[in-house]
Amino acid sequence: MSRIGRLPIDVPAGVDVAVDGQHVTVKGPKGELSLTIAQPIRAEVQDGQVLVTRPDDERESRSLHGLTRSLIANNIVGVTTGYTKGLEIVGTGYRVAIKDKGVEFALGFSHPVYVEAPAGISFTVEGVNKMTVVGIDKQLVGETAANIRKIRKPEPYKGKGVRYAGENVRRKAGKSGK
């Protein structure tokens, strides 16, 4: 039995979990998320807990069991507290500012780069070189932060670029002069 999959998920007060066949809908104070679970896996709500079960011990069922339980648990955390991902902009002249429904970056290109916030995502900017991606969907928050980081990844010589908050950039030594 999957060690993660067999653990029941506690449903906190103020959160409503509805299971309709293979569709799980989670409603909470921050919003609503829905999830379609894979075919052999079943989910049910009992006594304020969500139980995820699998019908057999086939390889596919075992792999989907823990995944499904984690996805449902992530949705419950998302609608109660939400998710954040911090980004730091490092480099001379590199900056970020909120503009319309997104953010605008100056990252050393000949033009500013504008990133619009996807539905369900908001940006907060602290100063000119720190920002946070905020949302209730863990996967969408991480994907949006990764897409922003991809615009200008931290380079290994000076460390300039967009990095995650707390990320260590492996630095290389430059050319040694004569």
Swiss-Prot record:
InterPro entries with a match to the protein in the record: Ribosomal_uL6-like, Ribosomal_uL6-like_a/b-dom_sf, Ribosomal_uL6_a/b-dom, Ribosomal_uL6_bac-type, Ribosomal_uL6_CS
Keywords recorded for this protein, A-Z: Ribonucleoprotein, Ribosomal protein, RNA-binding, rRNA-binding
GO biological process, one term: cytoplasmic translation
Record GO cellular component, one term: cytosolic large ribosomal subunit
Membrane spanning stretches: none
Keyword rRNA-binding belongs to the record: yes
GO molecular function terms noted in the UniProt entry: rRNA binding; structural constituent of ribosome
Superkingdom classification of source: Bacteria
Signal sequence segment: none
Function: This protein binds to the 23S rRNA, and is important in its secondary structure. It is located near the subunit interface in the base of the L7/L12 stalk, and near the tRNA binding site of the peptidyltransferase center.
Assembly description: Part of the 50S ribosomal subunit.
Family: Belongs to the universal ribosomal protein uL6 family.
Protein name: Large ribosomal subunit protein uL6
Species this chain originates from: Clavibacter michiganensis subsp. michiganensis (strain NCPPB 382)
Gene: rplF
